[in-house]
Every structure is written in structure tokens, then in C-alpha cells.
UniProtKB/Swiss-Prot annotation:
One of its GO terms (biological process) is amino acid transport. It catalyses: L-arginine(in) = L-arginine(out). This is Arginine exporter protein ArgO. Keywords: Amino-acid transport, Cell inner membrane, Cell membrane, Membrane, Transmembrane, Transmembrane helix, Transport. Coiled coil: none annotated. Involved in the export of arginine. Important to control the intracellular level of arginine and the correct balance between arginine and lysine. In Yersinia pestis biovar Mediaevails str. 91001, the CDS has been disrupted by IS100 element. It comes from the Bacteria. One of its GO terms (molecular function) is amino acid transmembrane transporter activity.
Amino acid sequence: MLAVYLHGFILSAAMILPLGPQNVFVMNQGIKRQHHLMSASLCALSDIILICAGIFGGSALLSRSPLLLALVTWGGVAFLMWYGWGALMAAWRGDGVASSATSVTQGRWRILVTLLAVTWLNPHVYLDTFVVLGSLGGQLLPDIRPWFALGAVTASIVWFFALALLAAWLSPWLNRPVAQRIINLFVGGVMGFIAFQLARQGFGL
């Protein structure tokens, strides 16, 4: 059982660690110390749903529906381009972190919607959870499959909370105007690059 658990943990960690929209968003919220634990919780919860759905039979849905995959892909391209452009404009204007209570309250809902879009409009999430984890987990015997899923889920929870807390700890250094401008440029570049990659996949290049 432990070997199966560790297999799920290591495989899930290997897919989560590369830089992607979720990681960039959680890191940025941690640096701002703006609902970063909520962001980590929502990312982890979304991963739990997707991982369990993929391992326990949902992978067939994506593999049998090219139209669904295309819709998710192009929806992701549009969203990432919009989000990346916003980050680049913030870098250009030198926008800082809003400090008023009203802005923070409004920001909570905007963060929620943006985070759900970053997660659920990202085709790579479905490929990782449904195709990779789903195909490998589906080959296991039913009595040990939950251990594989538990390992994969644990890796996701540990990673997102560690990322959010580490970014928040480093925020006194990373939340300065110059650092924020660099981070916004970095976020905009990453989002644009991922959108370009998704567009190439959508065109079949």
C-alpha cells in the first residue's frame, strides 16, 4: 500500500512542480498576502476533484470528446491571454497592491473567479489528471486504487500550501514596487507563453 501511495505522490508532484497558471497565480497571491490560503485551498480542492474523477473513471470522457477538449483549449487560450495582458499592463503602470477594505472585499470574489478559470480552463490540468493519472490509476486493482489517489491528492495539497506560505513569507522583499513590476512582467510572460503553446496544440502544430 505504501509503495502505491508513494507512486501516486511522486507522479502527481512531478506534474504539479513545473511552472503553470495555477502555480503562478498562487505564488502571486502569496506575495501580495491577499487570500493566499484561500487560493491554495481552492487549487487543492479542484485538484482533488479532478484527480479522483480521472482515477475513478472520468478519463474516458475527455478521450472520447475532441470537441470538449477543443472548447477547453481555446477557452484557456483566451483567458490566459487576457490575464497575461492585464499583468503586463499592471507592470507598465506600476500598479501596487490595493490597500482599502473595499478593494480587498471585491478582490476576494475576483480572485475566486480568476482562480477557477485558471484551473478549469487549463487543458493541461485535464491531461495530467484524466489522461496520465487516470490511465495509470485505472490499471490498478480496485482495492489499492484509493491509495494511489490519496498519494496524488496529498502531493497537490502539500505543494499549493507550501507555495502560498513560502511566497507570503518572502513578501516583504517581493512586494516592493520594483519587485512587483518584475513579477508582473514574469507573470505576463508565462501566461502568454502558455497561451501560445495551447494555441499551437489547438491548431495541431
